[in-house]
Amino acid sequence: MNNVLSTNIAGKEMKVEFGKIGMLSNAATFMSYGDTVILTNVNASSEPRVGIDFFPLSVEYEERLYAVGKIPGGFIKREGRPSEKAILNGRAVDRTLRPLFPKGYRNDVQVVCTVVSVEKDNLPEILAINAASMALCLSSIPFTIPVAAVQVGLIDNNFIVNPNATEREESTLHLTVCATKERVMMIEAGGNEIPEDIMIDAIKFGFDECQKIINFQEEAVSKFGKEKDVPTLFTVDEEVEKDIKEFASDMIKEAMYITDKDERNAAIDAVNQKVKEEFGEKYEDKFGDIKEVLYNMQKKVVRHMLLKDKRRPDGRAFDEVRPLGCEIGLLPRTHGTGLFTRGLTQVMTVATLGAVGDIQILDGIDEAQSKRYMHHYNFPGYSVGEVKPLRGPGRREIGHGALAERALEPLIPSEEEFPYTIRLVSEVLSSNGSTSQASVCGSTLALLDAGVPLKRPAAGIAMGLITSEDLSEEQVLTDIQGIEDFFGDMDFKVAGTTEGITSIQVDTKLKGFSFNVVENAIRDARKARMTILDKINECISSPREDVSLYAPKTETIQIDPDKIRSVIGAGGKVINKIIQDTGVKIDIKEDGSVFVSSSDHAGVKEAIKIIEGLTKDVKAGEIYLGKVTKITTFGAFVEILPNKEGLVHISKLDKERVNKVEDVVSVGDEILVKVTEIDSQGRINLSRKDVLLDQENKENKEEK
């Protein structure tokens, strides 16, 4: 049976089909918004997974190139590993859904969102969140709180819900708001220095728009939703809980109140060891219960410390930033380096400048795009004092790299202002909370050190939240450290400049958070950001006047677009010879902009001279210094500009009669010649005789 339901969202039809496809999945839906369609399949294991202390949720965001009528490139001609954008979209779906499952639910759950049709005006990543929530709500899986997502744009101080492709180009804000009926669940934002008040209003606007989609989901569930399963939730053995609390409660409290991180961790390890020695044999098959009890005890102490004692684990005020350190120019051969330290969090960011042609080409379900600014983030095990295998970047590294990239993107100078490709790499050297925002600060330092003329310096800060169990009390924290992140309820990352916000990323462990939290976090984040920017300005207040000695030197010239073929030559013969002879990189745009890059400045000058010669028009009446390239019985061929030759007829070689060309010139000689004619076929006629006569006349006049 095919169940169909539709509604109107922002002037476009949103439709869900349920029951027709994926009959063996717990729930499968086709959800469309305009011509963008997501196939969503959700399934769960029948029994909880034993021996784990987390919820095993897997969210897969699958892009199919047939969705945009493309055939994958390469030899295999099929989709490979997910693109970076697909990974980020999958993370957004996961972060929105995960807190809404029942506490203690340990069944394996898989959500697969497959993009099967894409209309560029309607983003599939926004629809995927709505489709995933819809499928879970319709399934028998114990997911009962609908969540919705919208994108908010800003054009001429007016908010736009789910802007189309043209509006997204014009918009200064790209905000994704995910919300339930009562609370905000997740926020992602990139903006062109958006003032705090406008950002808060935009989030409220997005929340209100989400309600229409939530009502749509509730209507669908009431009409054809499945009966929900009664889950088996993980609960701690009461006897284990009682014994551990009686034995370790005082020791846990004493350990958690130690201010120094290393000493506190050592004290906690000692308590854990004592508990193991005391109850290891009695509860040898209850290790998971013991671990859960110890975690809950520590969490309770931290919450009491913050909410009742009004103090933080390291003794800071709630709105206080940890001690800051900024340094530039650490590495002698790199193009720019920034070392940013905040408490025990430390990130070194290295900037590399490349030629314009070093851009990254992105080709997926979106239209082909290029990136001339990119940021990569590495988080090795040694940053937290652990032994871990070094592999390629995971989803977390990709997500953090993209977040820091987004924070600085609106501040990067245009290609016309700064003709370089820019790559940043942030190496996390030490991690105790908020390494992604430390990467923003390190990136600012590295870019300024590299001589990149940023619009303004940027900085980032992570805000946190601690609430009571009944949510009656809540406390926003500035610059959360590891322990506050681990036991806290929210990670609210904000980056920006003195003028406004450039990026936000918010996720929570709760079933949402209030607008009061949103407002306080955004306003407190600004105060902290100003403190950090002051410190950055003390270190370096403006970009270096020149790029590094080891960075490529890039110069730009403009040529007639019709002359581009003259520079490239047949099969690239001409441009490849220039590159080979001068050692430069050459990039040519369709509008005639030519970018010449090399670490050898002389090579750049020589290449430009050649290109200008290739594109310069030969004019009748002008005199050129040319090189004899070929001799015939009737005259000599002379190259007056690169790839431009003319003929000096034997009668035009000298003032006197010439019987043999070789009597006057040889191959390789440089001679002055005048262009006497360019015929209808473009052939150039030259005269050495006219030059000699002109010189003779000039000398005669001077003698008189």
Swiss-Prot record:
Catalysis: reaction(s): RNA(n+1) + phosphate = RNA(n) + a ribonucleoside 5'-diphosphate
UniProt keyword list: Cytoplasm, Magnesium, Metal-binding, Nucleotidyltransferase, RNA-binding, Transferase
Cofactor(s) in the UniProt record: Mg(2+)
A single BP term in Gene Ontology: RNA processing
Cellular component terms per the entry's GO annotation: cytosol
Broad class of where this protein is predominantly found: cytoplasm
KH domain mapped to chain residues: 552-611
Cell compartments where the protein resides: Cytoplasm
Gene Ontology MF, one: polyribonucleotide nucleotidyltransferase activity
Residues at which Mg(2+) binds: D485, D491
EC code(s) of this entry: 2.7.7.8
Every S1 motif domain range: 621-689
Record InterPro entries: ExoRNase_PH_dom1, ExoRNase_PH_dom2, ExoRNase_PH_dom2_sf, KH_dom, KH_dom_type_1, KH_dom_type_1_sf, NA-bd_OB-fold, PNPase
Record PANTHER family: POLYRIBONUCLEOTIDE NUCLEOTIDYLTRANSFERASE (PTHR11252), POLYRIBONUCLEOTIDE NUCLEOTIDYLTRANSFERASE 1, MITOCHONDRIAL (PTHR11252:SF0)
Role description: Involved in mRNA degradation. Catalyzes the phosphorolysis of single-stranded polyribonucleotides processively in the 3'- to 5'-direction.
Family to which this protein belongs: Belongs to the polyribonucleotide nucleotidyltransferase family.
Protein name: Polyribonucleotide nucleotidyltransferase
Organism per entry: Clostridium botulinum (strain Eklund 17B / Type B)
Chain's gene name: pnp
